Structures are given as structure tokens and as C-alpha cells.
């Protein structure tokens, strides 16, 4: 090669110029500039210098390098990937690299004594350890498991090979150079491969037979595995050149076999024992399939442990088409389950509720309890005054005014016994409790003003009490007034079938005055006497059961529910289920505001700790655990949601038509509230007179006073219009009406109510239609059009012919076709209408049999407005 500059030489070698200059200076050559020329002699000196430094690096390298690696994996052993057992596999690999100069020293080391292999019983989880001792020589293989020969040494004798292998094991215990640099290892591999010449004869002779056998065995295994005849007995993680050794976790493996020998009988037995397989069941598996009222095809297939496609096939064979997400009924599910050979078990809708009743612990100890009294009556008849007087006079000393005003129930102790009063202004709570079947009230006190007599709400209270089959005690209030007339009250109540005992009936009448306190003690005595007749008793030692009187959301304490315990004892810390809500009782507050630890029958308490606010009238019960409470609460919420969605249609005057069907008699329900009784009767009579044979007006509820929550509930349940005459709805009723999308109509003039209801009834009448002929055209000639078909050339002889109107084709005054006028042209121009005396071309939609002389009659359908 010709002389080159330092820069050109650096480009040829592929290193930076600065590095080449440093190497030239280290070699003893004086080069300082990249433009200096380098001759052949200087290149040779540089090359010898670089080779010398490389040899020094190699001689300074360690004589032995051992590399260890460990990897973890999992293997599924069994018939398939789903039913097999997963075992953990640990693969240990070791590679030892030895310099040539170290071999003679290792040959002098004696061979260590190898302890015998101890076989241990199999465990569920095994660890696979592959100790790999590899050199440049090829590896020896056997038929089943690869076993690697020791490292080949420079000497050509087998003894020296074994000594070298022993020395490797000894060096392994010393853990020399475990974390060697990977680049150095690769360089040393190249050096060792060049430095260790191995005789071809000795390299090939011991491996020809075993390697050939192994290849034949491997080929046969692969062919059988591809054909599906044979499963692989183990997973291979490395090449066949590596030694693999199976170990049990915590002990030696029973799979380890001696080198150069065949598998022993014990090894074969152990392998057969550990071979996982799947045995087909000898008899079909019959399952009990739980079937609710509705279930999807996918869920039904899952419960039978089959694929959804199988269920769909069975349903198709039975003549029913279904998709995987389709909901099928209980009867269809039973037929499908029986067809597939399983046993159906029908689940009832209230199975969760039934299970709740079974889970509640029943008590055995019964004791007498205090009566629960509800005071009802008409507005301004003294109900609140009576409650205030009893509260003021019967509260224990030092607790005057200590009754919590929000609780809605309180307990009164008298010398003759205890009484629990429910403060239920109006009838909303009582109605809700009776509707939910919660018979919380034992006695009803009916308050009637002696100077006012029986009023509509008084009659309503009597109806509620009779429907609940609760005894009534009549308290004639305001006896201190000069115009008090108790005889008039008794006469009016006898009309409602409330007969006093003095007249031979079974109802006690007590004359009282809530203002002066006259007759209050007699009223309490009558209550206790009536309770003795009823023989009220309750279980005291079982799980508590009661009813929610009212509930509210307290800003500082969260949901607070007033619960009247009916049986059992409610303790602090119990799991309470109340309607849709549940929770652990965090605190119990009595009616006078004190914290208590428990509450027995007929005792009202405030409960803190529920998840949300329950409804008034909900049943409250103590359940054994929170899981059961959550299950029942979620079930009730789902059922309530379904019912709510089922009646999702709104109640408005505009939507009445949507709720009516042609086959049903059309009735307009009205809930009416007015300010005075006279106006109420006048409006009711005027609306009732609007009824005809086709539509009727039915006032399902009417009363004097403001619109309450119970009125809104009644309007929702009966699909009625809520009308208020000179009255307004309270806050609770407004919120409920907005929540349920019920419109409340306010009026101040009676005639406005009559006109509005008359318009609603008019809209409910069945519509009537009339056909009016607007024009007649006579066909003079027929033309053919490639786009439309037959075109009738006509003369309008009467009226106006309009496009897109319905038409009739008459031939000899007989209707032969009825359709729509599709095309209307005059002098090739599309027109909307053609009047009498003009010619036009008419195209009839989907009809081509038009002939000269036919008449085309154009008409319109007009709806006739109906009035009452």
C-alpha cells in the first residue's frame, strides 16, 4: 500500500484521528498532525504495538469465567389448557469458559465424590433447573432428556475431561466472577475456540450413536405430535445442546438419571404417575338449573355449563328463534333445560324476601306492650291542641318542652299504663302505612269539633280506620264553647255507621276540651281500656321489627329515620333494613332527645346510620349480616325501578289521548281541591254534567284545603288531573309533582275549569272524517311515457284538480281504482293545480289501465270538529 496521511489512515481503519495520533505516539512514533505521511514501516510498528497490547489484555484476563442465569415461567400440565394444572418452572443455566493454560493445573485436581441421587415423592409444584456447563465441544444427547457431557480439555483422555468437570464444580462453589462483563465473555469465547484444538475422532465417536438416537426420537415425537397422537411430555426452554435437570422444590428430583444409561423402571412409573390426562365421564352430568321469571340465553347456557350456541340450537329445534342476549320467559327456559337433560328449579319472584324471613331470628318471650294511638280529624278541629295538651301535662318533671318536635311520635307514661302517640297531621303517613300493609296503629282517636260537626276529612278518617280494621274512639272537642252541640255530632256520625255506646253501638264517645283540659284523663282511660280489650302483646327477645314513621335528612347527622318498634328489641350496632335502605345503627335517640342503647316494642326512636332516607310506612327489620341486607335492598330497588318504568307515562291534559284506547270506555279522572265546601260541590256538579255516552268525568277525590302529598299520590295512581280552586300545593306536594311530572292546574273562576275540562273531553271524542270532491277530469286520450307510464290527457270539467291528492278512477260510474295523483302537467310544465275548462296531463301512481272516457275524481279528506 502507498504512503497515506494520518487522516486517510484513520478513515480506512474507522477510528477518530485523535485516537490514531495517540496510538502512534504510544508506539514511539512522532506524529502530531493529521496531514503527516505514514509509510509501510511505521504501519508495521503500529500494528505490532497494537497486537502486544491485545496479548497483555488477554493474559490479564481471568483464567475461568462462570456465567449463571435463572429464569421463571409457568407450564400447564394436563389434557387441555383449561382443565390442566399450572406448575412453576425455574430454569437455571451455567456456562464456564476456561483458558488453555489453566487446563494442566485442573488435571491434577482429584475428582470429588458425588453423593447418590435420592428419590423423593412428587409434589404439586415442581422446579425445573437446567445446569448448563458448556464449552466449544458439542453436547451429548439421549433419547428422552438431554444430558451434557463435561467440558473437553486439551488432553485427549476421558479422565482429564472428568477432572476438568470436577474442577468446574469446585470453582462453582467459590462463585468466581459471577457477574462477568458480557463483551469480555464474547471475546474470550473466540479466543478459547481458537486455542483449544480437539481431535475430531474423539469428538465424534462418543456422540454419533446418542445424537443419532436423539434425532430419530425427536423426529418421531414431532411427527406424532403433529398428527395429534402424542402430547409433549415437557416444555423445552433452551436448545438441545443444554443440560436440563428436573428438581422438586425443597429437594432433589426423581427424574434425574445417570449419564449414558436408559431410563429406569422407577423413572417410567413416576412419569406415568405424573402424566395428567382427562377421562371422559361414564355418565351424563345432570345439573339443577335455577330459573328465574326471566333469563337471557347466555345466562341459561352458563348455568348449564354449555355454550350458548347449543342452547340456541335446541331452541331452533323446538321452533323458537333466539339470540344470545335475548330474554326468554320461565316456561321456555324450563322446556329448554328439560330438553337438554337437566333438572329445572323454578325461582319465585319473592324468593329473596322469603329468604329474609327465614334468616330473621324469631323470639319466644312475649310481654304486654303499650297501645299505639293515631289521632285523626278534620282541619281546625283541635287535633294539634289535644296533642299539645297531652304533651305538656304528661311529660316528666324537668323535661317540659323537651319533646323533639320533629320526631312525629312520642311515648307517654300514666299511672295506669304507657301510651304511644303518632303525630300524623293529615292522613298521608297513615295511608302509606295501610297501603304497605304495616298495621302500626292499634287505636284511632277521631277528633270532631262540637260546633262544626262531621266534615269530609272526618269521613275520610273513618273510612281509613274501617279499612285498617282499627277500633275508633271519638273525642268530641271544643265542649267549652257555648255553641257546642254533641248530639248533632253523634247524629252525623251515626250516618257513617259510627254508633255510640249510649245508643247501643260499640264506639266510645268522650267529651273533651283541649283548651281547658276537660275530659283528657277520661280519654286516656278509654284508650287504656280499649288496649286491655285488645290484649296487645309482642315478642321482646327476638330480632327487632318495626315501621318507619317518618324520615328526614339532617345536615349534621345524615339520614335520620323515626322507627316505631313493633316486636323484638332494637339495639345499637344492629344491621337494620328499612325498605330500599340499610345500614348499621350508629345511634338511637329517644322521643325526648336522649341517647339510648335499645328500644323495645311500641317505643319510637330515631335511628342514625342508614344509607339513605327510607319512605314513611316502610317496614324496618333487623337482619343477621350486612350482606343479606344489601342483597334484599338491591332486589327491592330493582323491582321498584321496573314498576316505575312500567307506569312511566305522564299524566297531563295533553297526554290523555295517548292513554286511551278505542275499545275502552273513556273516563277522565279528576282530583279536585277547593277552598270552601260550597265551591267544591258546585264544581263537582258542573263537571259531572259534562259527561256523555262516549266520555265521562269522574271526580275520584274532592276535598277542602290545600293540595297535599297524598293528593299527588292519588293522582299518580289513578291517572287523574289535579285541579286546585283558590288553593295551592304545599312544598312537599310540589316537589313530588315535579319529580313524577304531574301537572297541577290552578283556577280562580269556575267557568274556566268547566271550559278546560270540556276541551279535554272534546279531544277524547273519536274523530270523524268527511270526503269532499274538489274536481273531476275526463280522460280524452292516453299517452305512454317511459318514466311514468300511462299519461291521461284530460279536460277538467268540474272544480280544481290538485297534485298529490287522492283520486278515484271511474269507468261507467263505477270506481275501478283508488290511488294518488302523482303527475300533473300542462304543456310539459309541472303545475300544482289545473282549474275547470283547462286541459292537462295526469299520471296516476301505480296504475296504467287508464282508457279514454274514464273520469278521474279528485277528493280531499276533511276532519269534522266535534263538540259535546
Curated annotation (Swiss-Prot):
It comes from the Bacteria. It is found in: Cytoplasm. Residues 158-178, 200-269 are annotated as: Disordered. Residues 368-537 form the tr-type G domain. Residues 249-260 have a biased composition (Basic residues). Residues 477-480 are annotated as: G4. Residues 377-384 are annotated as: G1. GO terms for molecular function: GTP binding; GTPase activity; guanosine tetraphosphate binding; translation initiation factor activity. GO terms for cellular component: cytosol. Keywords: Cytoplasm, GTP-binding, Initiation factor, Nucleotide-binding, Protein biosynthesis. Residues 513-515 are annotated as: G5. Residues 423-426 are annotated as: G3. Residues 402-406 are annotated as: G2. Residues 200-209 have a biased composition (Basic and acidic residues). GTP binds at residues 377-384, 423-427, 477-480. SUPFAM superfamilies: Initiation factor IF2/eIF5b, domain 3, P-loop containing nucleoside triphosphate hydrolases, Putative DNA-binding domain, Translation proteins. Belongs to the TRAFAC class translation factor GTPase superfamily. Classic translation factor GTPase family. IF-2 subfamily. One of the essential components for the initiation of protein synthesis. Protects formylmethionyl-tRNA from spontaneous hydrolysis and promotes its binding to the 30S ribosomal subunits. Also involved in the hydrolysis of GTP during the formation of the 70S ribosomal complex. This is Translation initiation factor IF-2. It comes from Legionella pneumophila (strain Lens). The lineage of its organism: Bacteria, Pseudomonadati, Pseudomonadota, Gammaproteobacteria, Legionellales.
Amino acid at each position: 500500500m502507498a504512503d497515506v496521511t494520518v487522516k486517510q489512515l484513520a478513515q480506512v481503519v474507522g477510528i477518530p484521528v485523535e485516537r490514531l495520533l495517540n496510538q502512534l505516539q504510544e508506539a514511539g512514533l512522532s506524529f502530531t498532525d493529521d496531514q503527516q505521511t505514514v509509510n509501510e514501516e511505521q504501519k508495521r510498528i503500529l500494528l505490532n504495538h497494537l497486537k502486544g497490547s491485545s496479548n497483555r489484555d488477554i493474559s490479564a484476563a481471568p483464567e475461568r469465567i462462570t456465567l449463571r442465569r435463572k429464569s421463571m415461567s409457568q407450564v400447564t400440565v394436563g389434557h387441555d389448557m383449561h382443565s390442566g394444572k399450572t406448575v412453576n418452572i425455574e430454569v437455571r443455566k451455567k456456562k464456564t469458559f476456561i483458558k488453555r493454560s489453566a487446563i494442566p493445573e485442573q488435571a491434577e485436581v482429584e475428582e470429588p465424590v458425588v453423593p447418590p441421587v435420592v428419590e423423593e415423592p412428587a409434589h404439586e409444584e415442581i422446579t425445573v433447573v437446567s445446569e448448563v456447563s458448556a464449552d466449544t465441544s458439542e453436547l451429548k444427547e439421549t433419547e428422552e432428556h438431554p444430558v451434557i457431557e463435561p467440558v473437553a480439555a486439551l488432553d485427549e483422555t476421558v479422565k482429564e475431561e472428568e477432572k476438568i468437570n470436577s474442577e468446574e464444580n469446585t470453582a462453582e462453589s467459590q462463585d468466581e466472577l459471577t457477574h462477568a462483563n458480557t463483551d469480555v465473555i464474547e471475546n474470550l469465547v473466540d479466543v478459547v475456540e481458537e486455542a483449544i484444538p480437539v481431535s475430531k475422532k474423539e469428538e465424534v465417536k462418543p456422540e454419533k450413536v446418542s445424537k443419532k438416537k436423539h434425532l430419530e426420537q425427536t423426529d418421531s415425537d414431532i411427527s406424532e405430535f403433529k398428527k395429534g397422537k402424542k402430547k409433549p411430555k415437557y416444555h423445552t426452554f433452551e436448545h438441545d445442546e443444554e443440560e436440563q435437570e428436573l428438581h422438586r422444590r425443597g429437594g432433589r428430583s426423581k427424574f434425574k438419571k445417570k449419564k449414558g444409561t436408559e431410563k429406569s423402571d422407577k423413572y417410567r412409573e413416576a412419569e406415568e404417575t405424573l402424566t395428567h390426562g382427562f377421562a371422559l365421564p361414564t355418565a351424563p352430568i345432570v345439573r339443577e338449573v335455577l330459573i328465574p321469571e326471566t333469563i337471557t340465553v347466555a345466562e341459561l347456557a352458563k348455568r348449564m355449563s354449555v355454550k350458548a350456541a347449543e342452547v340456541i340450537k335446541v331452541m331452533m329445534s323446538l321452533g323458537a328463534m333466539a339470540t344470545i342476549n335475548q330474554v326468554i320467559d320461565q316456561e321456555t327456559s324450563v322446556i329448554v333445560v328439560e330438553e337438554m337433560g337437566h333438572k329445572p328449579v323454578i325461582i319465585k319472584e319473592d324468593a329473596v324476601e322469603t329468604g329474609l324471613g327465614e334468616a330473621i331470628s324469631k323470639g319466644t318471650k312475649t310481654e304486654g306492650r303499650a297501645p299505639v294511638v293515631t289521632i285523626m280529624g278534620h282541619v281546625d278541629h283541635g287535633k294539634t291542641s289535644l296533642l299539645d295538651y297531652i304533651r305538656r301535662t304528661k311529660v316528666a318533671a324537668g323535661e317540659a318542652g323537651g319533646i323533639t318536635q320533629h320526631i312525629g311520635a312520642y311515648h307517654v307514661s300514666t299511672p295506669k299504663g304507657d301510651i304511644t302517640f303518632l303525630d300524623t297531621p293529615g292522613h298521608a303517613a297513615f295511608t302509606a302505612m295501610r297501603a304497605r300493609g304495616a298495621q302500626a296503629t292499634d287505636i284511632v282517636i277521631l277528633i270532631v269539633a262540637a260546633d262544626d260537626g262531621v266534615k269530609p276529612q272526618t269521613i275520610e278518617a273513618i273510612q281509613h280506620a274501617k279499612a285498617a280494621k282499627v277500633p275508633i274512639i271519638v273525642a268530641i272537642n271544643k265542649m267549652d264553647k257555648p255553641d257546642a252541640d254533641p248530639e248533632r255530632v253523634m247524629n252525623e256520625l251515626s250516618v257513617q255507621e259510627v254508633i255510640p255506646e249510649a245508643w247501643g253501638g260499640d264506639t266510645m264517645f268522650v267529651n273533651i276540651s283541649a283548651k281547658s283540659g276537660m275530659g283528657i284523663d277520661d280519654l286516656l282511660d278509654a284508650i287504656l281500656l280499649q288496649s286491655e280489650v285488645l290484649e296487645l302483646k309482642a315478642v321482646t327477645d327476638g330480632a327487632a321489627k318495626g315501621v318507619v314513621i317518618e324520615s328526614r335528612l339532617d345536615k349534621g347527622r345524615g339520614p335520620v329515620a323515626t322507627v316505631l318498634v313493633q316486636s323484638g328489641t332494637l339495639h345499637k350496632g344492629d344491621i337494620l333494613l328499612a325498605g330500599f335502605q340499610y345500614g348499621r345503627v350508629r345511634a338511637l335517640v329517644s322521643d325526648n332527645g336522649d341517647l339510648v342503647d335499645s328500644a323495645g316494642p311500641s317505643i319510637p326512636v330515631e335511628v342514625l346510620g342508614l344509607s339513605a332516607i327510607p319512605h314513611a310506612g316502610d317496614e324496618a327489620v333487623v337482619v343477621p349480616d350486612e350482606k343479606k341486607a344489601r342483597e334484599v335492598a338491591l332486589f327491592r330497588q330493582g323491582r321498584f325501578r321496573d314498576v316505575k318504568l312500567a307506569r312511566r307515562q305522564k299524566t297531563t291534559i295533553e297526554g290523555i289521548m295517548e292513554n286511551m284506547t278505542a275499545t275502552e270506555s273513556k273516563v277522565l279522572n279528576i282530583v279536585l281541591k277547593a277552598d270552601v265546601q260550597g265551591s267544591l260541590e258546585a264544581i263537582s256538579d258542573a263537571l259531572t254534567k259534562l259527561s256523555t255516552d262516549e266520555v265521562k268525568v269522574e271526580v275520584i277525590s274532592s276535598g277542602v284545603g290545600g293540595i297535599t302529598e297524598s293528593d299527588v299520590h292519588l293522582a299518580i295512581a289513578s291517572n287523574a288531573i289535579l285541579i286546585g280552586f283558590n288553593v295551592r300545593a304545599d312544598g312537599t306536594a310540589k316537589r313530588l309533582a315535579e319529580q313524577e311530572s304531574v301537572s297541577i292546574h290552578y283556577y280562580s273562576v269556575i267557568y274556566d275549569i268547566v271550559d278546560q275540562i270540556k276541551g279535554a273531553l272534546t279531544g277524547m271524542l273519536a274523530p270523524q272524517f268527511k270526503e269532499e270532491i274538489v274536481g273531476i277530469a275526463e280522460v280524452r286520450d292516453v299517452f305512454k311515457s317511459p318514466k311514468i307510464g300511462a299519461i291521461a290527457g284530460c279536460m277538467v270539467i268540474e272544480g280544481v284538480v290538485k297534485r298529490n291528492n287522492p283520486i278515484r278512477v271511474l269507468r261507467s260510474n263505477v270506481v275501478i281504482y283508488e290511488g294518488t295523483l302523482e303527475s300533473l302537467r300542462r304543456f310539459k310544465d309541472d303545475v300544482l293545480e289545473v282549474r275547470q275548462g283547462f286541459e292537462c296531463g295526469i299520471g296516476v301512481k301505480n296504475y296504467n289501465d287508464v282508457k279514454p272516457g274514464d273520469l278521474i275524481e279528485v277528493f280531499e279528506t276533511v276532519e269534522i270538529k266535534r263538540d259535546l
